[in-house]
Regions:
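His/Glu-based metal-binding/catalytic segments typifying zinc-dependent metallopeptidases
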Residues: 53-116
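Charge-rich, well-structured scaffold segments of protease-associated domains
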Residues: 1-54, 92, 98, 114, ...
C-alpha cells in the first residue's frame, strides 16, 4: 500500500508518455483490409505528438533467483504453484528465437504429456489438467514457468529437479528429440489458422526484428547438441524458484 500511495499524477503521466509513445509502437493488421484503409484510420485516430526514443537502463541482473520460495494464502480451493527458471539476459533477434525454441523442446521432453515425468505426476495425483509450461522472453529478460494445481507442490518441484538432473546425465534421446521437433513445427504451422495469433506473432517478431520465415525455420534448424547445452545452462537449481498459493484456512 505504501508504494501505491507514493504514485503521483505526475509520475503516471510520465509513464503514460513514455510507454504509449509512437516510437515505442508497432501496428499489425490482419484481415480483409487494404493498407490505404488502415492508414486512413491511423490518420484519423492518432494525434500528432512529439516522439522520442525510448531509453532503457542497462541492469546488471544477477544469475541466481532472489528467493528460492514464496508462499501466500489466497481464496483458492486447491493449492496452486509455479516453478520458475530465470534466464540469462542478453539474447536478441534470432538468438532469442532459437533460445525460445530450444526451451520449448526441452519442456516437452521433460514434462510434456508424453513424458515419463508427466505420467508419474498425473498417476500419483500430484497434478491435474491445469498443469502447463511456458517460456516468456523479451528485451533483457526470459523465464521458464511450470505450474498448475497440486496438493503437494514441493514434491512436484523435487520430482521436476530430479527429472532435469536425470536428463542432464543421460542426454536427450535422438528419436524423442526428432519427434518433439516435428510436433512443435506442426503446432507453429497450425497457429497460422488463427488471425489473432498471426497478428500477435508478427508483433512479437517486429520487436525482435526477426523475419517470419526465419522464425518458422528455427523449429527445424535447432539441433540436439544446442538443446543439451541449453539444458545445462538454463535449467540450473540456483536459477530456480517456486511460488505457492495456499487456500486460506477456514475458521
Amino acid at each position: 500500500m505504501d508504494t501505491i500511495a507514493s504514485i503521483t499524477p505526475e509520475l503516471l503521466y510520465t509513464c503514460y508518455q513514455s510507454f504509449y509513445n509512437p516510437a515505442n509502437m508497432v501496428l499489425v493488421v490482419c484481415g480483409d483490409v487494404t493498407a490505404a484503409q488502415v492508414l486512413a484510420v491511423c490518420d484519423k485516430v492518432l494525434k500528432p505528438r512529439r516522439t522520442a526514443a525510448v531509453r532503457r537502463p542497462v541492469i546488471d541482473e544477477p544469475r541466481a533467483a532472489v528467493r528460492d520460495r514464496t508462499e501466500l494464502a489466497l481464496p483458492v480451493s486447491t493449492p496452486q504453484f509455479m516453478v520458475g527458471y530465470k534466464d540469462v539476459p542478453g539474447a536478441t533477434g534470432m538468438e532469442a528465437v532459437r533460445r525460445a525454441v530450444q526451451t520449448e523442446l526441452l519442456l516437452e521432453l521433460l514434462c510434456g504429456q508424453s513424458s515419463r515425468l508427466y505420467g508419474e505426476l498425473y498417476t500419483q495425483g500430484l497434478i491435474n489438467s491445469s498443469f502447463e509450461t511456458e517460456y516468456m522472453y523479451g528485451d533483457g529478460f526470459g523465464v521458464t514457468l511450470i505450474g498448475g494445481e497440486s496438493r503437494e507442490p514441493d514434491r512436484v518441484r523435487a520430482m521436476l529437479l530430479d527429472a532435469v538432473e536425470s536428463l542432464r546425465r543421460t542426454g536427450v534421446c535422438a528419436a524423442d528429440f526428432e519427434r518433439i521437433q516435428k510436433k512443435l513445427y506442426g503446432r507453429a504451422v497450425r497457429q497460422l489458422n488463427s488471425v489473432d495469433r498471426v497478428a500477435s506473432l508478427f508483433v512479437d517478431l517486429a520487436f525482435l526484428q526477426v523475419d517470419f520465415a526465419d522464425y518458422m525455420q528455427a523449429y527445424l534448424s535447432v539441433g540436439l547438441d544446442e538443446c543439451e547445452q541449453r539444458l545445462r545452462t538454463h535449467f540450473v537449481p540456483e536459477a530456480s524458484a517456486i511460488s505457492i498459493i495456499q487456500p486460506i484456512e477456514k475458521a
